């Protein structure tokens, strides 16, 4: 049985009775085939029993929680079954060694930038971006501090958003990237997709031997899986941004799917459902992998990226970020 993500939008109770997981809401009680669940995303007010959490932990199923506004709150991260002390030590050493950390941080930024360039060319708004990248890549290579790397990344992203705006319809311009709260519809859409993508990457990291809290571009900190932030730089342009662009240009997402709240703009529940339908379809789409010579889903590409990072950390093969060929 192919495992799938389960999204819970309605309020209710998630509990275990004997060896069956149930979700009960105002519409009734529904048994869930736990063997077919890969991970769970909770957007409603859901009470989860300790027995249900114990059952989910046994099955290795992460649960990601989002608040009323669609912002990521946190994850139930089951005890890891793929532990490797040797890899964790190597992962930490690459963080502690400034040169090794800089190599990886720069590669994440480079990969992200090249994927942004791919998007702009696809949308026919790439004027001047390639030349700008050449200049900023020179700055990137000469950077000696992570803060300098982050500064280059921020400038690349700013130029990217400015050009992307030229491809977007009126009423869905980014104008300026704003987050908490997003100040307009496009910012709300991008933030919502990025939040879901981050949680997806956390699930993929759970299924590897990598420690999700040891990262290189983003500073490791408490209360976040910072390695997921590193990997999200690669995938935001080619997953989240492409979905956002398609939804607004094809008129699938409309102004009515947003609401004003928190001095900003947020998706309605119906809007979230529309976006997540497109998101899940996108992750399930297959592309022909040039190295593996076979079709893999876009979600699988995230896991493969983590495996490439592992090979780099253990000295098998230098990491090269995914640059979209599709």
Swiss-Prot record:
Residues the record lists as binding Mn(2+): 153, 218, 233
CDD domains per the UniProt record, alphabetical: Cas1_I-B (cd09722)
PANTHER family, per database record: CRISPR-ASSOCIATED ENDONUCLEASE CAS1
EC number of this enzyme: 3.1.-.-
Family per similarity comment: Belongs to the CRISPR-associated endonuclease Cas1 family.
Protein name, as recorded: CRISPR-associated endonuclease Cas1
Gene Ontology terms for molecular function: DNA binding; DNA endonuclease activity; metal ion binding
The keyword Hydrolase is annotated on this UniProt entry: yes
Gene3D superfamilies registered for this protein in UniProt: CRISPR-associated endonuclease Cas1, C-terminal domain, CRISPR-associated endonuclease Cas1, N-terminal domain
One Pfam family matching this protein: Cas_Cas1
Obligatory cofactor(s): Mg(2+); Mn(2+)
NCBIfam families reported in the protein's UniProt record: cas1, cas1_HMARI
Biological function: CRISPR (clustered regularly interspaced short palindromic repeat), is an adaptive immune system that provides protection against mobile genetic elements (viruses, transposable elements and conjugative plasmids). CRISPR clusters contain spacers, sequences complementary to antecedent mobile elements, and target invading nucleic acids. CRISPR clusters are transcribed and processed into CRISPR RNA (crRNA). Acts as a dsDNA endonuclease. Involved in the integration of spacer DNA into the CRISPR cassette.
Superkingdom to which the source organism belongs: Archaea
Subunit note: Homodimer, forms a heterotetramer with a Cas2 homodimer.
Keyword entries, A-Z: Antiviral defense, DNA-binding, Endonuclease, Hydrolase, Magnesium, Manganese, Metal-binding, Nuclease
């Amino acid at each position: 049985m192919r495992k799938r993500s389960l999204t819970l939008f309605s309020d209710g109770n998630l509990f275990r009775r004997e060896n069956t997981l149930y979700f009960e809401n105002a519409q009734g009680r529904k048994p869930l085939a736990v063997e077919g669940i890969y991970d769970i995303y909770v957007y409603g007010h859901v009470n989860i029993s300790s027995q249900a959490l114990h059952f989910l932990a046994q099955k290795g199923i992460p649960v990601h929680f989002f608040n009323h506004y669609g912002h990521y709150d946190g994850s139930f991260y089951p005890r890891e079954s793929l532990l490797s002390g040797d890899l964790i030590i190597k992962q930490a050493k690459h963080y502690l060694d400034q040169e090794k950390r800089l190599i990886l941080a720069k590669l994440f930024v480079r990969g992200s930038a090249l994927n942004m360039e791919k998007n702009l060319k696809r949308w026919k708004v790439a004027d001047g971006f390639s030349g700008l990248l050449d200049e900023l890549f020179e700055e990137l290579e000469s950077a000696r501090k992570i803060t300098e790397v982050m500064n280059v990344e921020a400038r690349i992203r700013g130029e990217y958003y400015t050009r992307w705006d030229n491809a977007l319809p009126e009423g869905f311009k980014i104008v300026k990237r704003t987050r908490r709260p997003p100040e307009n519809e496009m910012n709300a859409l991008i933030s919502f997709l990025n939040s879901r993508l981050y949680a997806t990457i956390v699930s993929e990291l759970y299924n590897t031997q990598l420690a999700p809290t040891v990262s290189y571009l983003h500073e490791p900190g408490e209360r976040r899986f910072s390695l997921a932030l590193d990997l999200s730089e690669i995938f935001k342009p080619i997953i989240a941004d492409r979905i956002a662009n398609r939804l607004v240009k094809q008129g699938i997402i409309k102004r009515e799917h947003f609401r004003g709240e928190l001095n900003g703009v947020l998706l309605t529940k119906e809007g979230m459902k529309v976006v997540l339908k497109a998101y899940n379809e996108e992750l399930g789409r297959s592309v022909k992998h040039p190295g593996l010579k076979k079709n893999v889903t876009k979600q699988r590409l995230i896991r493969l990226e983590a495996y490439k990072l592992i090979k780099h950390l253990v000295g098998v093969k230098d990491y090269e970020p995914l640059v979209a060929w599709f």
